[in-house]
Curated annotation (Swiss-Prot):
Composition skew (Gly residues), residue ranges: 279-303
Protein name, per record: CDK5RAP3 protein homolog
Pfam family, one: CDK5RAP3
Biological process per Gene Ontology, one example term: regulation of mitotic cell cycle
Short sequence motif named Shuffled ATG8-binding motif 1, residue ranges: 311-314
Lineage: Eukaryota, Viridiplantae, Chlorophyta, core chlorophytes, Chlorophyceae
Function description: Substrate adapter of E3 ligase complexes mediating ufmylation, the covalent attachment of the ubiquitin-like modifier UFM1 to substrate proteins, and which is involved in various processes, such as ribosome recycling and reticulophagy (also called ER-phagy).
Oligomer status and interactors: Substrate adapter component of the UFM1 ribosome E3 ligase (UREL) complex. Interacts with ATG8 family proteins.
Family indicated by similarity: Belongs to the CDK5RAP3 family.
Domain notes: The shuffled ATG8-binding motifs mediate interaction with both ATG8 family protein and UFM1.
Renumbered ranges of motif Shuffled ATG8-binding motif 3: 369-372
């Protein structure tokens, strides 16, 4: 049988001789490959150290400016390629010997170059430099460049964030200042000036208190309370005389149920203590109760401005002892020998009873003593007298404000006095709010009751002053009361009141505004710092780019030197290719 015909391609590896194939060497195994194939001696490290020491000594004798004029600059290390460049530069300007040899520094560097080329020591140095540059130097520079690029991007992002935050802080500060009604130029002075708005707001509150609807609401409240608490027909009464009449007691009048509200409505508000001064103190002394000198103080401890009133009780006291007995005069004895039977009989006669006088044994009930004093009538008369005296005193004090004082009370207008009192007297203001809240609660409950219906039986027993008020009227009264309470409870009013009366609140408010104003400056400073970091990152990138490019170019030249040197050591018959990561590094640098 004949052999099958086999097609063979000319120029493929099968037909090419081995001597013509290229040699591929990994850059990381280059020195090992050279030593293994005995292209360089095993002690090439020692020989290289000797050559580098001679080169370092020769560098000191170079003319100034020689290194800076080289390809890689003055900072590049001295290796074989640099030695060749120095020799060629010096040889171009150096004198030669009779036989054409180099003289001076050029001859020294020519010897260094020949030492490198002897036994291909420079190939070991080139392989070592390739590994150092590809595995360490270039990756470090690239990581550093990526880090600087990240810092640059982060700086740009932070600059935008800080700029927006500064604008937000400025807008918030302006909004707070606008809400407070200040410009923000001089915070504390402007905040203090805000307190001047408070008298006008309080005068508006006082004017609202004079609405007729509030008077109707208070009278409606008093009428309903009198009806609810009035004694019913057939109920036992323990009082006698005028106290058992059908008239309402003073405590159930609108003026006594809502005292502060009607004090302002009747324009009887006393000025603040700081403005009333001694006149206010004198008025309070004249309008007070009657002081009784009991004779046991031993000095002039009675009320100032009011003479002590001596009351003769028509009863002797117990006998004093010692010096007190001598000063008090003769002793008087009191006979406490009462006959309870006689007292009970007298009480029975006064009551019109016909039964026999009870005895004083243990079975007898409690005995009441009639002192023949009408307590209720006397108390009412005394209370009315004191109220009239107090009204006169308060009126005089309010009238005296026209000649002195300051602020809103200096005009002498009772409404201005009330506004000043509400501003400076927290207790007085709280009592007014209590009166209005009490009135509002009553009206709200009555509105709910009237809206629920089913009160026909109760309505028949109500007096006309209560039954004539329908749900719509109660709602109108409730709206008036809530409007006044709304004026006293607005955030603006509370804030102005705190600014005017609380230095600590003023300090805290000023500190908060100052912090908001400083926040914008902090954000702007942070933005400026971010811009400075961007400049530093750009400068680092700008300085690093030429260094990386020079190092990559150096690696490319070293690679060519190695490939040509190994090919020359092999007689120039085979080409050499240095492979591995070095090609990726050079390719990425070329993009």
């Amino acid at each position: 049988m004949s052999e099958p015909a086999i097609a063979r391609l000319i120029g493929e590896g099968v037909e090419r001789p081995e001597a013509s194939l290229p040699i591929d060497i990994n850059y990381a195994k280059l020195t090992e490959w050279l030593v293994t194939r005995q292209k360089i001696p095993k002690d090439w490290h020692k020989r290289l150290q000797v050559i580098q020491a001679k080169a370092a000594e020769a560098v000191k004798e170079l003319p100034p400016g020689t290194l800076s004029s080289l390809t890689d600059g003055a900072d590049a290390p001295v290796d074989y390629m640099r030695a060749v460049e120095i020799r060629d530069k010096l040889a171009s300007t150096s004198e030669r010997t009779m036989f054409g040899g180099l003289q001076g520094p050029a001859a020294t560097w020519d010897k260094i170059v020949k030492a490198y080329e002897k036994q291909f020591v420079y190939l070991g140095e080139a392989g070592q430099c390739l590994v150092q540059n590809v595995d360490f130097e270039i990756p470090y520079l690239r990581r550093n460049a990526a880090k600087l690029a990240g810092q640059l991007a982060d700086g740009e992002r932070k600059q935008g964030e800080y700029t927006r935050a500064a604008a937000a802080c400025a807008a918030k500060y302006k909004e707070e200042c606008k809400k407070l009604g200040i410009s923000g130029a001089a915070v504390r002075a402007e905040l203090r000036a805000l307190a001047g708005e408070l008298p006008g707001l309080l005068r508006g509150v006082v004017d609202s208190l004079h609405q007729p609807r509030l008077q109707e609401a208070a009278e409606y409240y008093a009428a309903f309370t009198r009806f609810a608490h009035a004694p019913r027909a057939g109920a036992p009464s323990s009082a006698k005389g005028p106290a058992s009449s059908a008239s309402a007691p003073p405590a159930l009048e609108p003026e006594s149920m809502l005292p502060v509200l009607f004090e302002i409505r009747n324009r009887r508000t006393a000025p603040p203590e700081a403005e009333s001064g001694a006149a206010g103190a004198g008025a309070s002394g004249q309008g007070g109760g009657i002081e009784i000198d009991w004779g046991d103080s031993g000095g002039d401890a009675g009320g100032a401005g009011v003479a002590a009133i001596d009351i003769d009780w028509d009863a002797p006291t117990a006998a004093p002892e010692g010096d007190a007995a001598a000063a008090a005069g003769p002793a008087v004895d009191i006979n406490w020998d009462f006959d309870m039977a006689d007292l009970a009989a007298a009480a029975g006669d006064d009551a019109g009873g016909t039964a026999a006088a009870p005895t004083a044994d243990a079975s007898a009930g409690p005995v009441g003593i009639d002192w023949d004093i009408e307590v209720d009538a006397a108390g009412d008369a005394a209370a009315d007298a004191n109220n009239r005296a107090g009204d006169v005193a308060e009126g005089e004090a309010a009238a005296s404000l026209s000649g002195g004082g300051g602020g809103g009370a200096s005009s002498g207008d009772p409404d201005d006095v009330a506004a000043a009192r509400l501003e400076r007297d927290a207790d007085y203001r709280a009592r007014l709010v209590d009166d209005l809240t009490e009135l509002r609660a009553f009206l709200a409950q009555r509105k709910s009751d009237l809206a629920a219906g089913g009160s026909e039986l109760t309505a028949t027993a109500l007096p006309d002053a209560v039954s004539s008020v329908d749900a719509a009227a109660v709602a109108s009264m409730l709206g008036s009361v809530q409007a006044v309470l709304g004026q006293l409870g607005t955030p603006r009013f509370r804030q102005l009141l705190l600014i005017a009366t609380s230095p600590r609140y003023l300090d805290r408010l000023e500190a908060r505004l100052q912090r908001q104003a400083g926040a914008e400056a902090k954000m702007l400073a942070a933005a400026a710092e971010a811009v400075a970091r961007q400049h530093e990152a750009r400068a680092g990138l700008a300085a690093q780019a030429p260094r990386t490019a020079a190092l990559v170019a150096r690696c490319r030249r070293l690679k060519g030197v190695v490939e040509r040197g190994i090919a020359a050591s092999l007689g120039g018959k085979r080409s050499v290719n240095v492979l591995g990561e070095i090609n990726n590094v050079l390719a990425s640098a070329g993009q």
